[in-house]
Amino acid sequence: MSKNDSIAIIGGGLAGCEAAWQLLNKGHSVTLYEMKPVNFSPAHRSSHLAELVCSNSLRSNIIENAAGTLKEEMRRMNSLIMSAADATSVPAGRALAVDRRAFSKFIEKKLKEFPKLTIIHQEITDIPADGLVIIATGPLTSDSLSQSIAGITGNSYLYFYDAISPVIEADSIDYEKVFRASRYDDDGQGDYLNCSMGKEEYELFWKTLTEGQTVSLRDFEDYKYFEGCLPIEVIAGRGVSTLLFGPMKPVGIVDPKTGKQPYAVIQLRQENREATLFNIVGFQTKLTWTEQRRIFRMIPGLGNAEFARYGSIHRNTFINSPALLEKTLQLKTAEHIFFAGQITGVEGYIESTAMGLMAGLSVSEFHKGKSFLPPPPETAMGALLNHITDTDSKQFQPMNINWGLVSPLPGKVKKRERGERYAHRALESLARWQSETSAEH
């Protein structure tokens, strides 16, 4: 491939714009395809690039928070999106929020300063058969392009809705009130943490759950729920006993404290190899975040639960990245195709941007005939990349950045010091990685 070959990027959202910026700054020619204003998705309204569809907040700006550290890492990697956010920020306390119109205009202006950028406003319906391409079309990828993606990945690896259960930080679980067991497990060394309930406890939980406030549907979301991934509150709404034959069924479980089968059981499944996160099995939900905290903390052992990820069900086109992508974000079966942004299975503005940044750097190295060295897992960026490329593909679901994804700190660390220690280590690791990778070029 000659140096003059233009790299195609499909999608002018946060990830696509960030990938373009990284490539342009390294001297590459880029053709950015954006279907607006010729065609609009059901959620988009503006004709500008990098439109923020939902909130105007990029979440916490505090370095001790994983989201804050991820943003700081991107700043140190010359992120266009972070420069735009800082330049167009509006008062939002400890969060980073932006004037969304000024934000988009800033990004568009900076990109258009590069003579090697070509922007083509048209819908791409088929993935190019040759030439380097980054697919960064986001959660509302058009139907025609989705079909093309399914054609190269396989239908079973492309999803159109999230059905996400809450994830709890392991060190916030009260282990005196839970027990380890799998169904029909005789030796008691099971793979699940179990939270048992008696009849009265269960009925109070069921009543509270059915009365919980749920998130309103967005205009572009029209749910026809699959029976296999119904929201927990919808199952509960079908009758007081339905959960006992579904996510809270007690069959095959024996509580070691009583020697008997509990009336109801909630199971927690390990979410990552480090066992720092646990998933509440089968509890996908449309409850608001406030209600999730209130109601799910009624579960024995979760009275002080800290949520690394809240449950949700929403429109979201994404691929099963662990099954499909290399750590370089290349498709395993077609090395000229890279994926970036939310379609890879990250969740959120900054996470999508981060994967756009990674894709841009990775494509640049590949274009030069070199191998891309990902950031270490101690960094927020590296942890996200690990999540989408090195997770059990059978259990894969989109995730925001949180400290549970990052390699655990050595030794015992006080909770109030944990965020600061994680952040300090992440930024030190990033600096070493930047030094090592720059020395190679």
Curated annotation (Swiss-Prot):
Taxonomic lineage of the native organism: Bacteria, Pseudomonadati, Thermodesulfobacteriota, Syntrophia, Syntrophales
Keywords of this entry: Cytoplasm, FAD, Flavoprotein, Methyltransferase, NAD, NADP, Transferase, tRNA processing
E.C. numbers: 2.1.1.74
The family this protein is said to belong to: Belongs to the MnmG family. TrmFO subfamily.
One family name in Pfam for this protein: GIDA
Biological process, per Gene Ontology: tRNA methylation; tRNA wobble uridine modification
Substrates-to-products reaction catalysed: uridine(54) in tRNA + (6R)-5,10-methylene-5,6,7,8-tetrahydrofolate + NADH + H(+) = 5-methyluridine(54) in tRNA + (6S)-5,6,7,8-tetrahydrofolate + NAD(+); uridine(54) in tRNA + (6R)-5,10-methylene-5,6,7,8-tetrahydrofolate + NADPH + H(+) = 5-methyluridine(54) in tRNA + (6S)-5,6,7,8-tetrahydrofolate + NADP(+)
Superkingdom in the source lineage: Bacteria
Protein name listed in UniProt: Methylenetetrahydrofolate--tRNA-(uracil-5-)-methyltransferase TrmFO
Binding-site positions, FAD: G11, G12, G13, L14, A15, G16
Keyword presence, Secreted: no
Enzyme class, broadest EC rank: transferase
InterPro entries: FAD/NAD-bd_sf, MnmG-rel, MnmG_N, TrmFO
Role according to the record: Catalyzes the folate-dependent formation of 5-methyl-uridine at position 54 (M-5-U54) in all tRNAs.
Species: Syntrophus aciditrophicus (strain SB)
Cofactors required: FAD
Cellular-component GO terms for this entry: cytosol
Annotated GO MF terms: flavin adenine dinucleotide binding; tRNA (uracil(54)-C5)-methyltransferase activity, 5,10-methylenetetrahydrofolate-dependent
